[in-house]
């Protein structure tokens, strides 16, 4: 970079001050690497002064900048003989040289920052190996249907992954696990198995009623001991449902109803009491379940359902998927090394992590993510699992803060052989062993839900760093925010959740993703009707823009006509376009802030809409190339976010995901012909005043084409705009329009009715002679004068002058109304 002559002189003085010649030449080469000194370079006195300090160009080929510069200066001075002659900086007559060039200052490029739970700050993202990013994500524990809480994490991480890969161009290696060995799975598998066996035995009504009463006893104790209000409310709901189903069956048994009638009530009670009976059956017979296939059947089923849900949500599959059941040998080896390193100990066939020993080490820190939660026994016990917090298990630990690496299996639990006896992995060690096997001693990103920070992720960090004897197993820890349901806490254990399948019955995968994009990935998201309505409106807003641009691009024009002169409006819109692109980039660099990105994109579309509306009002064609560039950019961004399938060239695809046929390019030529034919027919019908043909034309637009997913938009004096829109969307629009028209008609009728009532009331008032208007108010007045004006109140007291004056005004007003009424009678204007 070339600076001013004064700056160059200062640089050269600094170089000349170096006493060692080799170091001086090296410094000169460094300086010259930032400047242009090719033919035509403008010679300065500082160049000459430094040149004269050198006897010859350097022999070292690595100092080629000095060598080229030396020969160039020598040539400008007229060869070797001119090196000691006075320097004439003015070029010889007729010879010109290029002026000195100054590069632009530029701006500091924006760097990606991610909110790192390890620091609770937005840290500059620096992968450990160039552009390669290693990423491990905690997957689901598969014992039930996937719900919107899962969607919150996996859609959010899918968006982050796509942005890192497709926008920032990182090479992302994404790993995810499936937890198919866990206390929840074991308990649920046993309960399902035992309940189905019980149902198949078809217990008589009297036996079922007895069993339900027996099951209710421990359930009632559990209810009385529950302090959490949400959990208590859930248990009370179960209790009430069981009672409501029990009473009809008891009545049926007492009344000796037919077997069919009793059986129907038995089935109702079985369904309502399933949770109650399952817990009771497990407590009495769970230890007798020994077939390992029972414990693998349940997670296999729900894992498959999970993958179907992720595909339906357009969530990319991981590069590697690990299952705990497939990594038991690696987990055993992982635990053994932790013990060998001095951070684990065996106790009664189980192995525990020694948190005190780990925390005392100068190399390690325990509780990196949530240090304030260390010692929280409730959270620690939840992390251990329901089957692992009995008094005998807790007594095996050296400290209550220690957690299980390996659990000795009890009767009724699956088991695998290991050096400490038959058992199964602890929850936290599963992720550590699988991630460590695939990603090694340190990964770039670890992701999971916010509620996994402690104890799960803190324990993962501890045991992994104990294994690798390092302090950097994870560089960036990302946690997605909670999801609430209409402001209420969502919990599978509280049975307060919406499954992904149920959510997809109401809204499309794109609409759900747009809702997530319109919120920060790390903050709480409220899944509610308001949230989804905002997403629907955003989708409609963007889609209308894409449809309008497509219509403009379909207008016939020759090749040269595609490139039109830019007026001030195009220049301004293009300036705004690039400004919004910069704003989008800055937002993505700022912790992948998709909420701001979506608003910037909305603002850009609003500017385009204003531009198109102005052109339409002026009967001028909008600039095709500019609008296409903007629409393609927006499409590109929505593709990156996973809101548009890859095959769509511009805007949202028509026909839904998985449609191989390019519906738009196939049917649009035919629709365009139909539109032009319809316009011609309408024109003739208007001229000939054939109302029936115009009505048929409107019916085609309003009733027939929407059923096929086609919208015709008529604009006075302009060609009909043809748009392909999702059929359901059009039918909803049609229904909404119908409701709006009905509401308008209802309001009009209501206004007419009110007006009629007001006129009737006014007429009724006008009919009253002023002399009679107060006579009926005996609850207010006791005496009246000859004109009917009150003089005394009900107690016989004479009215004050102020009261009398007020009544006099009312009397005179009524007198005027009554005269109008008499005049109307005389004129015959009353119907």
Swiss-Prot record:
Position of sequence motif 'KMSKS' region: 489-493
GO cellular component: cytoplasm; cytosol
Residue(s) carrying Phosphoserine: 102, 388, 390, 829
Statement: the UniProt record of this protein carries the keyword Protein biosynthesis: yes
GO biological process: cysteinyl-tRNA aminoacylation
Binding-site residues for L-cysteine, renumbered to this chain: 139, 179, 456
Biased composition range(s): Basic and acidic residues: 736-762
Pfam families recorded: tRNA-synt_1e
Keyword field: Acetylation, Aminoacyl-tRNA synthetase, ATP-binding, Cytoplasm, Ligase, Metal-binding, Nucleotide-binding, Phosphoprotein, Protein biosynthesis, Zinc
Highest taxon, organism lineage: Eukaryota
Residues involved in Zn(2+) binding: 138, 431, 456, 460
Catalytic activity annotation: tRNA(Cys) + L-cysteine + ATP = L-cysteinyl-tRNA(Cys) + AMP + diphosphate
Cell compartment(s), UniProt: Cytoplasm
CDD domains hit by this protein: CysRS_core, GST_C_CysRS_N
Residues that, per the record, bind ATP: 492
Region (Disordered): 736-766
Record-level Gene Ontology MF annotations: ATP binding; cysteine-tRNA ligase activity; identical protein binding; metal ion binding; tRNA binding
Reported cofactor(s): Zn(2+)
NCBIfam families according to UniProt: cysS
Protein family: Belongs to the class-I aminoacyl-tRNA synthetase family.
Functional description taken from the UniProt entry: Catalyzes the ATP-dependent ligation of cysteine to tRNA(Cys).
Quaternary data: Homodimer.
The protein's name: Cysteine--tRNA ligase, cytoplasmic
Organism: Mus musculus
Lineage: Eukaryota, Metazoa, Chordata, Craniata, Vertebrata
